[in-house]
């Protein structure tokens, strides 16, 4: 992502229109439009829940699918996104800290009143259990995770460092073929 790429802060949130999106979205090499978070952490305080709700509403009108990547904390901003979501996809790995955090979030989601069908789980690096019994995760979630992806090994690390989506870097790689098979 170029350092000078526009971000959410560049939107005229008081009067946002569809035409404003073209000025603030960054298109990645795969053709996905991305609305970036503010470039510095302290600038995030300038964004209000109302700004995000208006922006998300507009994005949902323009795009068939809107993915919001939030940090693993519960605050007013993230709750606004979670409440507005059709589906929450929580990414988990086979390590005790992540599993504990996932259990805490699952309890929070239940207390908030989210239907179990709203929350889905994706096990990242499913082939790298690190000696962890996968059944522990199933017990912690109270169900089998709906999705999983393998680690991707060196291809993922190399292309991430190069800023290239790994699915575009080597179409013949097994991990890429696996992912294409999952999405059809």
Please report, for each region that a protein language model flagged, where it lies by residue.
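Phosphate-binding loop that captures ATP/GTP phosphates
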Residues: 1-34, 45
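Phosphate-binding/switch loop-helix module in NTP-utilizing enzymes
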Residues: 37-78
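Inter-motif core of Ras-like GTPase G domains
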Residues: 58-61, 74-96
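G-domain G4 guanine-recognition motif of GTPases
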Residues: 92-93, 119-131, 148-154
């Amino acid at each position: 992502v170029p350092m000078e790429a526009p971000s959410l802060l560049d939107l005229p949130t008081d009067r946002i229109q569809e035409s404003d999106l073209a000025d603030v979205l960054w298109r990645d090499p795969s053709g996905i439009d991305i609305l970036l978070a503010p470039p510095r952490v302290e600038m995030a305080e300038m964004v209000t829940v109302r700004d995000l709700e208006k922006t998300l509403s507009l994005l949902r009108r323009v795009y068939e699918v809107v993915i919001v990547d939030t940090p693993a904390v519960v605050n007013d901003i993230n709750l606004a996104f979670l409440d507005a979501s059709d589906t929450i996809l929580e990414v988990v790995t086979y390590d005790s800290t992540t599993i504990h955090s996932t259990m805490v979030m699952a309890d929070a989601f239940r207390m908030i009143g989210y239907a179990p069908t709203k929350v889905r789980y994706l096990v990242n690096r499913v082939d790298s259990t690190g000696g962890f019994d996968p059944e522990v995760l199933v017990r912690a979630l109270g169900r089998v995770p709906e999705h999983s992806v393998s680690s991707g090994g060196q291809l993922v690390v190399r292309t991430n460092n190069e800023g290239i989506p790994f699915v575009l870097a080597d179409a013949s790689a097994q991990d890429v073929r696996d992912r294409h098979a999952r999405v059809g």
